[in-house]
């Protein structure tokens, strides 16, 4: 965790796994019915990584789950209930095998992920230009 994070509802923020970094001045807003989960899968052949830049906003109910790699640029915002993952988490035909297809996710600077948005594997969202 970088310098000066703002965490509203600290007991509802769940960070689990290895290789997780969040830049300076991140804001996490949580609530009893909408926890924020930042999770990596580090087992078998997978060594998940999550890297978030500076000034990111994580709203209630946000989930970010990585089996490979999720890179989040500076000043990105995640609205209520957004879910970003780099994996399908299991195959269609053999659901007993963990993880399944997993490809890197990259969110460039100033990307906003809207309310209840869900995205899996190989997303690349380009920087939002305010001009």
Task: Give the role of each language-model region.
Residues 131:
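Gly/Pro- and small hydrophobic-enriched strand-loop and loop-to-helix capping segments
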Residues 1-85, 105-110, 116-119:
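Domain-scale signature associated with acetyltransferase and cell-envelope carbohydrate enzymes
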Residues 93-98:
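Flexible, solvent-exposed loop segments that connect beta-strands
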């Amino acid at each position: 965790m970088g310098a000066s994070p703002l965490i509203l509802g600290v007991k509802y923020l769940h960070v689990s796994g290895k290789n997780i970094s969040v830049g300076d001045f991140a804001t996490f807003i949580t609530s009893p019915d909408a926890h924020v989960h930042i999770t990596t899968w580090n087992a078998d052949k997978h060594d998940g990584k999550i890297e978030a830049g500076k000034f990111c906003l994580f709203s209630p109910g946000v989930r970010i789950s990585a089996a490979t790699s999720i890179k989040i640029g500076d000043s990105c915002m995640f609205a209520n209930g957004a879910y970003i993952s780099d994996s399908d988490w299991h195959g269609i035909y053999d659901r007993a095998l963990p993880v399944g297809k997993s490809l890197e996710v990259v969110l460039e600077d100033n990307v906003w992920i809207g309310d209840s948005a869900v995205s899996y594997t190989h997303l690349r969202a380009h920087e939002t230009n305010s001009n």
